Amino acid sequence: MCNSKKRLALFASGRGSNGEALYKAMQEGYINGEFVVIITDHGTAGIVERSKSWNIPLIVIQRSDYDSKASFEQAQLDALEPYKVDGIVLAGYMRIVGAPLIERYEHRILNIHPALLPSFPGLHGHQQAIDGGVKITGCTVHFVDAGMDTGPIIMQNTVPVLPDDTEDTLSDRLLPIEHKTYKEALRLFCEDKLTIKGRVVYIED
């Protein structure tokens, strides 16, 4: 187990509910890590107010402020550099992470997706599950690679899909499971208990 706290960056585009669950788990000592900076691509996102209450530096990096994808991605790298982060946590970050960030932080970027990958990647995972007629769906915490929700899977948990489910009801049922799963996966990451071999993530007992 690593004794020193992992220095983590939180990337979020929305209200930051998963980020809040992780932050609380850190404050309670369950996760041996700390958010040292928050990056958002929306200056009016709910995570902005959360960052103030947490007293964590927030940096707004919006794609529209940059002439090119390359300059936008370089701005992300430049923003992170002073904080010397050990890992990046994506929590409702709605942009595809570019190659420069993935290469710089290989196997150190975590994401949560509201479906049982490799099924139903991309947007609207809840609705995809309903439309697909599956009886069970869930969430997946995975390392980020260059594909769309294709990185090595760390952990998954499930919920039933009910006959009368809507995207909203299924999302509400899954959200607390997302919080639980992400907290456990990040705890393992911060304790250096995850090893990647090919496509498989092994968890140290």
Q: Locations of the language-model features?
A:
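Short, basic/aromatic-enriched C-terminal tail that caps enzymatic domains
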Residues: E20, I196-D205
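Conserved beta-strand segments of alpha/beta enzyme cores
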Residues: E34-V37, P57-I59, R108
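Donor/substrate-binding cores of folate-linked one-carbon enzymes
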Residues: A25, D41, G87-V200
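Short beta->alpha connector loops at strand-helix junctions that form conserved
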Residues: I59-S64, I112
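Amphipathic, non-transmembrane alpha-helical secondary structure
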Residues: E20-K24, E49, Q74-E81, K183
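N-terminal Rossmann-like dinucleotide-binding module
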Residues: C2-G46, R50
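Glycine/small-residue-rich loop that forms an oxyanion/phosphate-binding "nest" at active or ligand-binding sites
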Residues: V60, D67-V85
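Short, structured coil segments at secondary-structure junctions
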Residues: W54-N55, Y105
